[in-house]
Amino acid sequence: MEDFVRQCFNPMIVELAEKAMKEYGEDPKIETNKFAAICTHLEVCFMYSDFHFIDERGESTIIESGDPNALLKHRFEIIEGRDRTMAWTVVNSICNTTGVEKPKFLPDLYDYKENRFIEIGVTRREVHTYYLEKANKIKSEKTHIHIFSFTGEEMATKADYTLDEESRARIKTRLFTIRQEMASRGLWDSFVSPREAKRQLKKDLKSQGLCAGLPTKVSHLISPALKNLEPMWMDSNRTAALRASFLKCRKK
């Protein structure tokens, strides 16, 4: 699974996921299903934001990669992927500027057009089940919820899907592709089933000679990214700016 993740996802996504896991004492090389889930959720958040801008009239517009529109404002502020301190700083700044209610939990995005925080979910189960779980946890009508599944289903607060159909189809296609690629490598069953994942983890640890003296139970600490999912491509023009904002790269 680790090899698949590194081959399948943008290097920046992988780096952000590794950073989030290590912050909570989790090892991406061992908890590989969690690694894949975090990467998937991060990429969906970035894809949700890609190419969506607000023009000088305050209207939402879609600008494909390569068009020189530096003066346009990005419609979505990406909160997911930042360390917790910076993420809350961004949230507080948005609340102070816009007057919106501060959420109890860190959301994934902020929509400057609709003036609301957005919680993104990516589920391997039925979308309505996961939607209800997330809604019960957040307990706030102010935060908009949008759930995607690997089967092409989606569910959103008041059936308001925020994005145009083409943008959502791009996300669904990417999720379906990830599922197909996992299945072709024999990884999908363990990704979906916790029992199968635990069996595979024990097998991997044994093959690496790491079982002796180590608990086989996986850590229950939850990474910030994993809190927003259960357990795709990016706008290349935005990658450099995001990297500068989200990561402090070490010189090798």
Curated annotation (Swiss-Prot):
Important for efficient shutoff activity (site feature) positions: K202, K203, K206
Keyword match NADP: no
Active site: E80, D108
Subcellular location: Host cytoplasm; Host nucleus
Record-annotated site: Important for efficient shutoff activity and nuclear localization: R195, K198, R199
Gene3D superfamilies to which the protein is assigned, alphabetical: Influenza RNA-dependent RNA polymerase subunit PA, endonuclease domain
Matching InterPro entries: PA/PA-X (IPR001009), PA/PA-X_sf (IPR038372)
Single GO term (MF): RNA binding
GO biological process, any: viral RNA genome replication
Main location as per UniProt: host cell
Keywords: Decay of host mRNAs by virus, Eukaryotic host gene expression shutoff by virus, Host cytoplasm, Host gene expression shutoff by virus, Host mRNA suppression by virus, Host nucleus, Host-virus interaction
Record's comment describing the protein's domains: The probable endonuclease active site in the N-terminus and the basic amino acid cluster in the C-terminus are important for the shutoff activity. The C-terminus acts as a nuclear localization signal. The C-terminus is recruited to host protein complexes involved in nuclear Pol II RNA processing.
Role of this protein: Plays a major role in the shutoff of the host protein expression by cleaving mRNAs probably via an endonuclease activity. This host shutoff allows the virus to escape from the host antiviral response. Hijacks host RNA splicing machinery to selectively target host RNAs containing introns for destruction. This may explain the preferential degradation of RNAs that have undergone co- or post-transcriptional processing.
Protein family membership: Belongs to the influenza viruses PA-X family.
Protein name in the entry: Protein PA-X
Natural source organism: Influenza A virus (strain A/Goose/Guangdong/1/1996 H5N1 genotype Gs/Gd)
Lineage: Viruses, Riboviria, Orthornavirae, Negarnaviricota, Polyploviricotina
